[in-house]
Amino acid sequence: MQISKAALLASLAALVYAQPVTLFKRETNADKWRSQSIYQIVTDRFARTDGDTSASCNTEDRLYCGGSFQGIIKKLDYIKDMGFTAIWISPVVENIPDNTAYGYAYHGYWMKNIYKINENFGTADDLKSLAQELHDRDMLLMVDIVTNHYGSDGSGDSIDYSEYTPFNDQKYFHNYCLISNYDDQAQVQSCWEGDSSVALPDLRTEDSDVASVFNSWVKDFVGNYSIDGLRIDSAKHVDQGFFPDFVSASGVYSVGEVFQGDPAYTCPYQNYIPGVSNYPLYYPTTRFFKTTDSSSSELTQMISSVASSCSDPTLLTNFVENHDNERFASMTSDQSLISNAIAFVLLGDGIPVIYYGQEQGLSGKSDPNNREALWLSGYNKESDYYKLIAKANAARNAAVYQDSSYATSQLSVIFSNDHVIATKRGSVVSVFNNLGSSGSSDVTISNTGYSSGEDLVEVLTCSTVSGSSDLQVSIQGGQPQIFVPAKYASDICS
């Protein structure tokens, strides 16, 4: 019997909904994260303690390259000067030490002991110092964590569970079976990620003894290291009922990785975790901005779908690249398309996430090539993308400061044609396009909410225009445009 894609997705969503629903109580910490702009870091690849900017790092080798907590500390001003208010760092706990078929666990996702810090990145005191240095700059720390699995060099049928801490017995894990059908939610949650070369033993998070240990651990982990937020890896592979108590025990905003592009599947996870990675928006965003041949209709429809399907889109995290997906600059070399994609992430709904190296135009494709050593770029503050991000973040930060409702307001599309999208959030009107570097267009945008004669500033060029309900916009060279009331721009374009 043939089953339609729509019916299949509906059944998957039903499985998510079928769990006993415990709505997450959104605490003030989650409210605080709505106004943040996040810079994502793979610790091993961002900055070295010794400050060396020529140390080799061949991504294909998959070795530790020397990035550290102290290295991050030394480059915090590089991040803050782009306007970021928070960082998200890769997992910090001890991982398996083996040189596997896929190299070492420099990325942090192959756990061995949740109570120890990975010494390749520094000491526990170094991590505490990183949190303190961030807080001294009025910035927040988000740490990536794994609750779904541990790691093992080799096949899953020969695991020595006694090497793990604290889950040192097979009884804490699901029986070995590799996921063969990602459309089967029971398999997705109970079978194992990984393969016969590197197994990822899958924890029984539905068991109260496993959940109790994790809840106690996360409370201490967050408290000991002054962590402000958590990113939860592989969330769709974990029993949903595990999350409400776990998130409450942590006491901080958490965002779950639900690697699925259908909002009917992804959005219900907000019943269990306050934030979710916005994969439903990721796919149409990259498809629209990577080529001049795409129409905006898929993207505008998904903006509407996410707004209606997710209980709180302002707590989703938006992105166009990360450590699991190829860098956007590998999809196109057109600088205006890349600039539009970056600006769209920063000025859209939810919480923006920029992956380290986007500001330097790094262009690695999929893992491991999208995990380059940033120090080889020289941390150039004069790169076009660095300056674009700084101005777009400045516009967003000014809007958050000037308008107490900005962070909770939802994006609306106020104009679109095949190649141009104009959005409004609060008093910020942004115009994006996929015309390409040689493209130009004149458009009239209605329903801006601006008053006749109101002074506006386009922050990327610092040009002043006179506002009205109908805004005349001339797109040149395919560049994005961000309009704000003049009072927002006093520090941006002074």
UniProtKB/Swiss-Prot annotation:
Q: Does the keyword Phosphoprotein apply?
A: no
Domain of life of the organism in this record?
A: Eukaryota
Presence of the UniProt keyword Transcription regulation in the record:
no
Biological processes, Gene Ontology terms? carbohydrate catabolic process
The protein's name is Alpha-amylase
| Residues binding substrate, per UniProt | W110, H149, R231, K236, H237, G261, D324, R371
Q: What class of enzyme is it?
A: hydrolase
* Keyword line: Calcium, Carbohydrate metabolism, Disulfide bond, Glycoprotein, Glycosidase, Hydrolase, Metal-binding, Secreted, Signal
One Pfam annotation, family name? A_amylase_dom_C
Residues annotated as binding Ca(2+) 2 are D233, E257
State the compartments where it is located.
Answer: Secreted
Q: Name the protein family.
A: Belongs to the glycosyl hydrolase 13 family.
- Enumerate the cofactors the protein uses: Ca(2+)
Which interval of the chain is the signal sequence? 1-26
Query: Binding residues for Ca(2+) 1, per the UniProt record?
Result: N148, D202, H237
Main location per the UniProt record? secreted
**What EC number(s) does this enzyme carry?**
3.2.1.1
In its UniProt entry, the species of origin is given as Saccharomycopsis fibuligera
